[in-house]
């Protein structure tokens, strides 16, 4: 059974229940198979409002999920709905959707303004309306100073932001971004993350896929985790972190004198294992991951240690999946 990480409050009995509102994105028992290969198996979820990270290793089913959502694939079983409507019966919901695919399909000879305004025209805008909207969204993604530059001369990060701008030109209520940070330099990643967070604050429903846990953590707390085509977790990342405290974690500290450091900072029962790969490196095994990280800075400073690095070798998506999938990773 998939772990339930949703956090629900208590209903107020004095308030009459409101009419149910269909989620923006709804999958009900959705599967997609290619012969004996199951790309997605029995996925059920409903998403509305804010930013949700779609996490999974390569081949987990993230792109299949998005292709089903965008009508590029028909489900083998189950139903997919957008804004309460089956898009295979009525494609009108796609007028309210912006999609940023993983792979680039851009016209390098066009300027950013020409590229984005062309898509605005395809949404039925007049030439002047299209240019106005193109300028607005290019400014929103931080490209206002290069709107007349050819896309072929753009960096990877600038190209990604141009793709995001083209997906926003119709002012969509749902924005779907497939691996938007892949291949970007640190500055571009930070800029794109800021854009995604801002879209969530504006009340849009934003789905962003990644295979890197730390990327999603910097964008949102709401996540969906896929593994081998199955939904293994859905909900708040902090709740998942609390569950992870039930299993041992490794903390790696690199400093001038690993053994002296261990003597000053280690205190049972927080720590149940210690090892020294070399004179400068200390590995700590603990069940109290959050507590250790909260106490380490004070203990290091109070005891005058010179520490160059603190990291968590097992604090990644693969380790998280290993726990959620019962070790089958």
Show where each model-derived region lies.
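Conserved ABC ATPase "signature" region
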Residues: 117, 121, 128-146
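Walker A (P-loop) phosphate-binding loop of ABC-type ATPase nucleotide-binding domains
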Residues: 57-61
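Catalytic Walker B motif of ABC-type/P-loop ATPase nucleotide-binding domains
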Residues: 175-179, 184
């Amino acid at each position: 059974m998939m772990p339930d990480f949703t956090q629900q409050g208590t209903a107020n009995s004095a308030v009459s229940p409101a009419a149910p509102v269909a989620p923006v994105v709804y999958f009900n028992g959705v599967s997609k198979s290619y012969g004996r290969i199951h790309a997605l198996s029995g996925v059920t979820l409903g998403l509305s409002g804010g930013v949700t990270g779609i996490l999974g290793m390569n081949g987990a089913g993230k792109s299949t999920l998005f292709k089903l959502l965008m009508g590029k694939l028909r489900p083998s079983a189950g139903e997919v709905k957008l804004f309460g409507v089956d898009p295979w019966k009525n494609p009108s919901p796609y007028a309210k959707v912006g999609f940023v695919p993983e792979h680039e399909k851009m016209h390098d000879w066009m300027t950013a303004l020409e590229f984005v305004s062309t898509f605005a025209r395809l949404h039925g805008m007049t030439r002047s309306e299209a240019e106005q909207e193109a300028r607005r969204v290019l400014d929103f993604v931080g490209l206002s100073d290069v709107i007349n530059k050819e896309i072929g001369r753009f960096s990877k990060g600038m190209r990604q932001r141009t793709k995001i701008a083209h997906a926003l030109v119709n002012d969509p209520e749902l924005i779907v971004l497939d691996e938007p940070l892949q291949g970007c330099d640190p500055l571009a990643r930070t800029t794109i993350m800021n854009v995604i967070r801002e879209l969530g604050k504006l009340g849009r429903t934003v789905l962003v896929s990644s295979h890197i846990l730390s990327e999603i953590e910097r964008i949102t707390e709401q996540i969906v985790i896929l593994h081998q085509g199955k939904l293994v977790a859905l909900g708040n990342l902090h709740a998942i972190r609390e569950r992870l405290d039930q299993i041992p974690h490794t903390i790696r500290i690199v400093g001038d004198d690993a053994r002296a450091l261990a003597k000053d900072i280690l205190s049972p029962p927080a720590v149940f294992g210690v090892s020294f790969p070399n004179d400068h490196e200390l590995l700590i095994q603990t069940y109290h991951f959050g507590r250790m990280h909260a106490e380490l800075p004070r203990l290091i400073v109070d005891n005058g240690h010179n520490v160059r690095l603190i990291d968590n070798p097992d604090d990644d998506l693969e380790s998280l999946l290993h726990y959620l999938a019962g070790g089958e990773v």
